[in-house]
Amino acid sequence: LNHLYLAAQLVVLPGALIFLWHRSKPMYERLRNTILATWVLSIPIYAAFPVAPPRLAHSGLVDTITTQTGLSLDSSLTTSFYNELAAVPSLHVGFAVVIGMAVAAAVRNPVFRFAWLLWGPVIGLAVVATGNHYVFDIAAGVVAAGLGYLLGAAVARMTPRSPVREPALARA
C-alpha cells in the first residue's frame, strides 16, 4: 500500500494524462481541467486550515512509508516538496477517483474499465492504512474533486475555441 500511495501522484497521474492525450483529447482536457481546478480550490483550504495527518498526531500510528520504504516524509528534502499539514482534502483520493473515472471512460475492455473504477477506493484504503489520512479527509477529497470537475467544466465552456485550420492545398 505504501508504494500505491507514493505512485498515485508521481506515476499514475502523469501516466493517465499521457494515456488520455493519445487516446481521447476531450477526456484528457476534462481530467487536466479537473486536476487544475481542484488544486485551485484546495490550496486556500490548506493555507487556512492546516491539518496534520494521523501519523503526526502521536496517536500510536506508525509512519509505514518511512518504516517500510526507507523514505522519510519528515526529512527537510522531502518536506520541501510537499506540505505535511495538507491532509484535508485528500487530493490523493480525489485525484485517484477522477483519474479512475476518466481512464475507465477511455478504455474499451470491461475488465480494465472496472479495474480503473476501483483505483479511487484502493487509494482511499492505502492513505488510511499508511496513516496519512483520516476517512473524513477522503470524503473531503472526493468533494473537492467533484467541485473541481464542475469548475473545470465551467471554465472550459467559457473559453473560446479557435477554429481548426485546414492545411492549404498546394497550387501547381
Residue ranges and their predicted role:
Residues V12-A16, G94-M101, W119-A126:
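Hydrophobic, membrane-inserted alpha-helices
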Residues H22-V111, A156-A172:
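Membrane-interface loops
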Residues T130-A172:
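C-terminal membrane module of polytopic membrane proteins
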Residues L1-V11:
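N-terminal transmembrane-helix/juxtamembrane module of multi-pass inner/ER membrane proteins
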Residues W39-A47, L118-A129:
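Aromatic-anchored segments of alpha-helical transmembrane domains
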Residues P53-G60, N83-A87, V122-G148:
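Interfacial helix-loop-helix junctions of multi-pass membrane proteins
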Residues V11, G94, V135, A139:
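Active-site His/Glu-centered metal-binding helix of metallohydrolases
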